[in-house]
Amino acid sequence: MKVGVIETHHSHPIIPSVVVQDTSEDPGLIEKGENRFARQWYLPGAFAQYNINNNSNKDEEKKKKKEKKSKSENKKDGERQKNKEKKEKHKNKDKKKGKEEEKKKDIFIIDPAGNMYYNWLFCITMPVMYNWTMIIARACFDELQNDYLAVWFIVDYVSDVIYIADMFVRTRTGYLEQGLLVKEEQKLKEKYKSSLQFKLDFLSIIPTDLLYFKLGLNYPELRINRLLRVARMFEFFQRTETRTNYPNIFRISNLVMYIVIIIHWNACVYYSISKAIGFGADTWVYPNTSHPEFARLTRKYVYSLYWSTLTLTTIGETPPPVRDSEYFFVVVDFLVGVLIFATIVGNVGSMISNMNAARAEFQAKIDAIKQYMHFRNVSKDMEKRVIKWFDYLWTNKKAVDEREVLKYLPDKLRAEIAINVHLETLKKVRIFADCEAGLLVELVLKLQPQVYSPGDYICRKGDIGREMYIIKEGKLAVVADDGVTQFVVLSDGSYFGEISILNIKGSKAGNRRTANIRSIGYSDLFCLSKDDLMEALTEYPDAKAMLEEKGKQILMKDGLLDIEVANLGSDPKDLEEKVAYMEGSMDRLQTKFARLLAEYDAAQQKLKKRLTQIEKILKPVMEQEFLDFEEADPPTDKPGVTKTE
């Protein structure tokens, strides 16, 4: 209960009255000075001096305040959670938008180096070739246009659809930028629109066919703008030339096609001129079509083609021209024939010579060997063996020097080709089975192909082993000293000589061959020399130790290892080899240093000459500027000296 003094309004001695208010219902209304449920009574005067508070009401007020705070806090927490949820929703939406934008950016792109693009080039080449051959023919030969009108309309508009699709394909064809394939749609469209090809493509699909409604259907030359898409045909031929395994044959076929198209166009123009002058008007034009034999469409085209071929190739005789226009046309034909066919025939000749270049070079080697053997009086049997060996190389297409061919490739591609061809073969060798990949790659690049004739000895017993061999193709026999008795026959994938090139200490055979190995027929082998192996092992000391350990184990199994010698310290020969290698390295370094010093001296002399020339040019200029400076600023009087009047 809260007691407050409400009012005093008597003039006589004041007896204050006290109004007792029950504020348990709502303490907030008391603070505002109002209470809907006020219960008031007046207390006698002495109590009017005091405000009376009920403790229970205070506790209730505190509880209610706490409840309000908790409610407000709960509301705030709820709002915070809602805000978080909204933010998360916005983030998810942004992520989805970003993914959608990425999907839009990373649209389906055609790789210009892929098969899909090449196949599309073939598809677009067909309508281009159709337009280049049939539009001119239909325009000149009326029967050809009128008799097959429905067919021409179908093929024309199918080719137009392919033309339009080709423009879409161009907007989806990627291109390389800084070595990466561009896949952004906007960039692809902008690049295509800014190119000359877009303008030509756009002109080639302008619907000039609409003029049919005005001029009639007998004017197929209205579609002449379709010929502007010829660049696609050239691109297809270029890519086919790089893809085919027979490029020379393709080039010749391509040139023949160009010749036929030129003759075809010239024949159509000849028939058109004859029609304009009048059939049978003179001896030069096409004969009169009133004759049934010359009225046939086939005869018209074949006769014109025959005349065009004779004129452009300048072979045979044609009827002489009569009118001025006929003379002019024949002169132009002769000039075109001379220029075009001279170029084409020259190209064909160079292609044929290139096709025979390999054979000519190979034949030159054989001729040189024959002359040498004849000059040195080599026996006929040996001469026959040499010629048979050359014949085997040419017949089996092994006359090409692999190193000469692969030298034009970068080291990385050369290594990949060598790995693809030789790595599996090298892994079959026991001592190289567990070697690291880097060493195997080094060794693969050092394998040298060799071909042996029947009866050739690859190695003889007691020879110093400087190479190891891997059989690629053929059969070798381990024979006795008589060369006839065969102990073992080695076939494809076999190898020998791997221990001798390691020069293992304690080997009872040293680095000598322990058997005679002879080729039974023609054999293809890969050879790895000791020097190449040691050069590769200098960068792989752990691999070298592992190979020597494997070699020792193989020798121990065969009983060819002296363990006491093997357990001794380093061999003096090894130290000598190392010293010799160091001396060679020092010599190479000295040579390089001397070359660098000479280059430095030459560069220093050039700089001195240039400085001298600069001084000569600038010296008079500097002197003139110094004189001008002295004239502009004359010397002043010395300080402390005054002039007397």
UniProtKB/Swiss-Prot annotation:
It is found in: Membrane. One of its GO terms (cellular component) is plasma membrane. Residues 1-121, 175-199, 243-249, 357-645 are cytoplasmic. Its main location: membrane. InterPro entries: CLZ_dom, CNG_cation_channel, cNMP-bd_CS, cNMP-bd_dom, cNMP-bd_dom_sf, Ion_trans_dom, RmlC-like_jellyroll. The keyword Lyase does not apply. Residues 144-153, 219-223, 274-296 are extracellular. Residues 70-86 have a biased composition (Basic and acidic residues). GO terms for biological process: monoatomic cation transmembrane transport; visual perception. 3',5'-cyclic GMP binds at residues 439-561. The chain crosses the membrane at residues 122-143, 154-174, 200-218, 224-242, 250-273, 297-331, 332-356. It comes from the Eukaryota. Residues 53-100 are annotated as: Disordered. Residues 87-96 have a biased composition (Basic residues). One of its GO terms (molecular function) is cGMP binding. It holds the Pfam family cNMP_binding. CDD domains: CAP_ED (cd00038). The keyword Transmembrane helix applies. It is a multi-pass membrane protein. Coiled coil: none annotated. Belongs to the cyclic nucleotide-gated cation channel (TC 1.A.1.5) family. Visual signal transduction is mediated by a G-protein coupled cascade using cGMP as second messenger. This protein can be activated by cGMP which leads to an opening of the cation channel and thereby causing a depolarization of rod photoreceptors. This is Cyclic nucleotide-gated channel rod photoreceptor subunit alpha. It comes from Gallus gallus.
